[in-house]
């Protein structure tokens, strides 16, 4: 499955450069020029990663970041800025940004950061699937009166630190 990236920058040359290099790396890339357009694009088809400029017309990147992370917490966001400060980078990170990159952008660094962020996405998906497998592997099946009573007892004792031994056939 192709990983999808949304580039959000009001400078068309930056969008084109990032779109070109990331497409060459095998990613499916879309580009928009404002925070509002980004939110609409994410609502229609959430990407795996967003490259988001801080200084955008209308809604700025930090406001867009807040909304993106509240509505789509699984989407990784890398912030970009030509006038960034340490305070801005810290604020972006606290709001949920994966990383912060300063302009002029080193395309090598962007590719490296994108790969790391998408590795994190892959690991989170894998972790979720493994947890589901473990849960379903040890799930009690059946709807008999005895099984339902057993499930109720387990539900009651589960929050405690007590050791429980369940014995019976099979």
Regions found by a protein language model. Name each.
Residues 12-30:
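Two-component/phosphorelay signaling modules centered on CheY-like receiver
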Residues 45-51, 56, 78:
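Active-site beta3 strand of CheY-like receiver
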Residues 33-37, 60-63:
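Acidic catalytic/metal-coordinating carboxylates
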Residues 85-87, 101-114:
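C-terminal output helix
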Residues 15, 54-60, 81, 85:
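The feature encodes the CheY-like receiver
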Residues 40, 62-74, 91:
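Short amphipathic alpha-helix used as the core "switch/output" element in two-component signaling
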Residues 131-170:
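AAA+ ATPase active-site-proximal loops
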